[in-house]
Amino acid sequence: LIREDRRHLNTSSDSEVLLNVLASELQRFGAQRASASDIFAALSAVYRRVRGGYAVVVLIMGHGVLGFRDPNGIRPLVIGTRDGARGREYMLASESVALDQAGYKLLRDVAPGEAVFVDEQGRMHSQQCAAATHHTPCIFEYVYFARPDSIIDNISVYKARLRMGELLAEKIKRER
């Protein structure tokens, strides 16, 4: 990143690295007044360069808000909507309960490798920017990280925890 893109990193944060790669790719596309398709093309290049689990929401000043999820779906990302004073409004979050708390309704999960861009006019654009691979969500989202009242990838966290407990109890009974 330092040699190829001439970017200086201020921290050891993986988020800073990922966002610098995105900024470099946007710059490479010469996206002064980037369209949704320019942003999706830049993001496709980011997906080719970056490995790992992530769900990112970033404000691109003067353009809009971009949210994207890793191709394996390791980290969750959802989009919600509500009617506002200026029309339909969108919100991106890692958990459905964040939408609930802010008065939004869950629209859908952002698919692994998909990007959602809401432009300054409030229009939502979405595109599959990386080929989705084998969907491998992080088990700790269901076991520990997520709130029990969340829904991730159409799965109730509460019900998933109950089912895991039932399966664990069955296993313990068999081993006795």
Positions of PLM-derived features:
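Conserved short alpha-helical segments that host acidic/polar catalytic motifs at enzyme active sites
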Residues: 1-112, 117-176
